[in-house]
Amino acid sequence: QSDNPGFNWWLKAIDEVITKAVKTNTPLTVIKPDPAKHKAEMPTMLTTTWGQQMPYNKLLPNTAKGRLLTGCVATATAQVLNYFKYPLRGIGSHTLYYPANDTNGDAIEANFGNTVYDWANMKDDYRGNYTDQEANAVATLMLHCGVASEMQYGGPNEGSGAFMKDCAEGLRTYFGFSEAEHLVRADYSSNEWMDIVFGELSSGHPLIYGGVSPGSMGQDAGHAFVLDGYNKDGLVSVNWGWNGEVNGYYKIDL
């Protein structure tokens, strides 16, 4: 266990897979990339080790429960947008509130069309020193990614959450990623799913990936992170969006 909810989801999921394999006496395998279709391996694409607290949440309201967290969907989305350094500016505007849907609460507004994203001043790693300009550059992007994905914001103890379908919609509507799609793992076999994953990664497209823990509530229920490469053995590079903690290669055909 760690305090990283995305990694904890993976631990629970792999535990279920191993338990089932033992019960059914089934060998545990990892699906490997098909060299006829995909690159044999794809080196890790992301160089960022971003998280959800300062300076990433610097521009979010500071409430009685503490400063609101960016949310894992926003952190994952921001890291992918930063990888592409795109767009230069967004489209339109949108406003959310904290508490969610309470128009008398704190307004969290993103004016996408009037914002030029300061890609040049976004650091890969904010665990050391950084300037106000570097902090504001990444905090603006994080706020916009949250608002675009209809984030339900919460403080440090409750967490912030959003649905993956809203993330895809936000990428299309506010950031101009017209081909962004929301795919559901249950609609595909393991081989079909990993063929999609390897295909996108092999093409240089990091994936915003979501996991849901059955029976969990609150911050531990759903998690978003980034898949950004794979090795020849079929293990996939995961950036958990937790300040670089436990980033590495994992079996994700779960």
Question: What do the PLM-derived regions correspond to, one by one?
Answer:
Residues 1, 233-253:
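Catalytic Cys-His active-site segments of thiol-dependent hydrolases/isopeptidases
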Residues 2-160, 231:
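Active-site-adjacent structural segments surrounding the nucleophilic cysteine of cysteine proteases
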Residues 65, 70-74, 163-164, 190, ...:
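Active-site-proximal structural scaffolding
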Residues 78-81, 168, 172:
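Predominant activation on well-ordered alpha-helical scaffold segments within soluble catalytic domains
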Residues 87, 226-227, 245, 252-254:
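Short secondary-structure boundary/capping segments
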Residues 88, 161-170, 176:
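Subunit-assembly interface segments of extracellular/virion macromolecular structures
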Residues 118, 163, 184, 245-253:
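Short, solvent-exposed coil/turn linker segments
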Residues 169, 173-239:
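Active-site-adjacent substructure of cysteine-protease-like catalytic cores
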